[in-house]
């Protein structure tokens, strides 16, 4: 069961943020299956994070009341589809972290809104629908995921 989220551009930081639908303008803490997630000052993921796949490898901003930076996230399902093949999303996001020209913010916002969130809401959480950290925000990881070669493999 997925929470309803919306993408909002934060012009001050030039990032897209995920916010719960109906949240206050400053956002609100995200709740997990074990209750509210830790505060931004927390330095580690809860010890029982293994029971909930989506808590693995979350950046510090995931626990912020302003919400996580959406540019860090995509789903395994979308990585496998031909819809994403021509956009090569991981490379696009990596280029943005380097300050290089890439997909526009408007296009990225549409991608997350129309593709990813639709999948999450319709299909719910499953093992194949894991969250991968791809880059695009400068927040330090709370817990590093297993190494991946998204940026070097095509």
From Swiss-Prot:
<comment type="function">
    <text>Multifunctional protein that plays a role in silencing host antiviral defenses and promoting viral transcription. Does not seem to be essential for HBV infection. May be directly involved in development of cirrhosis and liver cancer (hepatocellular carcinoma). Most of cytosolic activities involve modulation of cytosolic calcium. The effect on apoptosis is controversial depending on the cell types in which the studies have been conducted. May induce apoptosis by localizing in mitochondria and causing loss of mitochondrial membrane potential.</text>
</comment>
<dbReference type="GO" id="GO:0039592">
    <property type="term" value="P:symbiont-mediated arrest of host cell cycle during G2/M transition"/>
</dbReference>
<keyword id="KW-1074">Activation of host NF-kappa-B by virus</keyword>
<dbReference type="Pfam" id="PF00739">
    <property type="entry name" value="X"/>
</dbReference>
<comment type="similarity">
    <text>Belongs to the orthohepadnavirus protein X family.</text>
</comment>
<comment type="subunit">
    <text>May form homodimer. May interact with host CEBPA, CFLAR, CREB1, DDB1, E4F1, HBXIP, HSPD1/HSP60, NFKBIA, POLR2E and SMAD4. Interacts with host SMC5-SMC6 complex and induces its degradation. Interacts with host TRPC4AP; leading to prevent ubiquitination of TRPC4AP. Interacts with host PLSCR1; this interaction promotes ubiquitination and degradation of HBx and impairs HBx-mediated cell proliferation.</text>
</comment>
<keyword id="KW-1121">Modulation of host cell cycle by virus</keyword>
<dbReference type="GO" id="GO:0006351">
    <property type="term" value="P:DNA-templated transcription"/>
</dbReference>
<keyword id="KW-1035">Host cytoplasm</keyword>
<dbReference type="GO" id="GO:0042025">
    <property type="term" value="C:host cell nucleus"/>
</dbReference>
<keyword id="KW-1079">Host G2/M cell cycle arrest by virus</keyword>
<keyword id="KW-0804">Transcription</keyword>
<dbReference type="InterPro" id="IPR000236">
    <property type="entry name" value="Transactivation_prot_X"/>
</dbReference>
<dbReference type="GO" id="GO:0033650">
    <property type="term" value="C:host cell mitochondrion"/>
</dbReference>
<keyword id="KW-0805">Transcription regulation</keyword>
<keyword id="KW-0945">Host-virus interaction</keyword>
<keyword id="KW-1048">Host nucleus</keyword>
<dbReference type="GO" id="GO:0019079">
    <property type="term" value="P:viral genome replication"/>
</dbReference>
<keyword id="KW-0010">Activator</keyword>
<keyword id="KW-1045">Host mitochondrion</keyword>
<protein>
    <recommendedName>
        <fullName>Protein X</fullName>
    </recommendedName>
</protein>
<dbReference type="GO" id="GO:0085033">
    <property type="term" value="P:symbiont-mediated activation of host NF-kappaB cascade"/>
</dbReference>
<feature type="region of interest" description="Mitochondrial targeting sequence">
    <location>
        <begin position="68"/>
        <end position="117"/>
    </location>
</feature>
<keyword id="KW-0053">Apoptosis</keyword>
């Amino acid at each position: 069961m997925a929470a309803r989220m919306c993408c909002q551009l934060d012009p001050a930081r030039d990032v897209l943020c995920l916010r719960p639908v109906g949240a206050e303008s400053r956002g609100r803490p995200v709740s997990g299956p074990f209750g509210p997630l830790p505060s931004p000052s927390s330095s580690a993921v809860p010890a029982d994070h293994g029971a909930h796949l989506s808590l693995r490898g979350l950046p510090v901003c995931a626990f912020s009341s302003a919400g996580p930076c959406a540019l860090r996230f995509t789903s395994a399902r979308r990585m496998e589809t031909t819809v994403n093949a021509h956009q090569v999303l991981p490379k696009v996001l990596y280029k943005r972290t380097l300050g290089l020209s890439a997909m526009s913010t408007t296009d990225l916002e549409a991608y997350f809104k129309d593709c990813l969130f639709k999948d999450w809401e319709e299909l719910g959480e499953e093992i194949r629908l894991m969250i991968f950290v791809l880059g695009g925000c400068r927040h330090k990881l709370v817990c590093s995921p297993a190494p991946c070669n998204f940026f070097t493999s095509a």
